[in-house]
Regions:
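Conserved binding-pocket/active-site segment within a compact domain
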Residues: 105-206
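An acidic, glycine-rich, mixed-charge low-complexity segment common to nucleic-acid enzymes
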Residues: 1-148, 212
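Non-transmembrane domains of secretory- and envelope-associated proteins
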Residues: 206-212
């Protein structure tokens, strides 16, 4: 199966996680989803314009490849993880080095393949927990500083990407987490979010100089 732009646009979530080629997953995500800023208009006066900034370095966290979720990686540096996934860290390696990781995070592999649709608000609902008052659900979102949630229902599952504000930016948000069948979202309020455009994040040559 070839993972390309048409695949991302039309993917319905119907795939066995064990059959996903993780190198191809990372490559197609880098090419068509990450390293972009996504621009939206909303019906909320507090946030008339919303920007989501999604970088390559967010990918490992969304896959559950962190110290908290996978116990036996040789590195937890996001850039190194991405490079290893494109080379020799195939799915069998990740499973054999921590069997519990796959059991707990396999649906996130599917969720990452749905990120194109989530970020383009394609057949999605957009929610906010900002108006939840005095509830356990509200406290969880407040703790994680989640402002917005984009939800895609498909193949009898709900995939949600949670968005938190970028430091020192009022209307720019970054992916906080990717969740599946999170019941907390049903306490959230639905809002209208319209995708306007996306722009490739240009590589900063000055900051990147000297990096290997």
């Amino acid at each position: 199966m070839e993972y390309d732009l048409e695949f991302l646009k039309n993917f319905d979530g119907n795939i066995l996680p064990s059959l996903i080629n993780i190198s191809d997953l990372v490559n197609v995500t880098e090419k068509h989803v990450s390293q972009f800023r996504y621009f939206y208009s909303s019906d909320k006066s507090e946030f008339p314009e919303i920007i989501i900034e999604f970088k390559n370095l967010h990918i490992p966290h969304l896959l559950g490849l962190s110290k908290d979720h996978h116990l036996n990686l040789s590195t937890y540096q996001a850039r190194e993880i991405i490079n290893n996934l494109k080379r020799d860290w195939n799915l069998e390696y990740l499973k054999s080095s921590d069997e519990q990781w796959f059991a707990e995070n396999k649906d996130k592999l599917v969720g990452v393949l749905l990120l194109y649709q989530l970020l383009h608000v394609q057949n999605c609902r957009v929610l906010t927990p900002l108006y939840i008052i005095n509830s356990n659900f509200g406290r969880r979102f407040k703790r994680d500083n989640v402002y917005f949630i984009i939800l895609r229902s498909t193949n009898n599952k709900e995939y949600t990407i949670e968005l938190a504000p970028m430091k020192n930016h009022d209307n720019v948000f970054i992916p906080k987490s990717l969740k599946i069948n999170d019941t907390h979202v049903h306490k959230c309020s639905e809002i209208s979010l319209t995708f306007l455009r996306s722009e490739r994040i240009k590589y900063d040559k000055k900051r990147g100089k000297g990096r290997k």
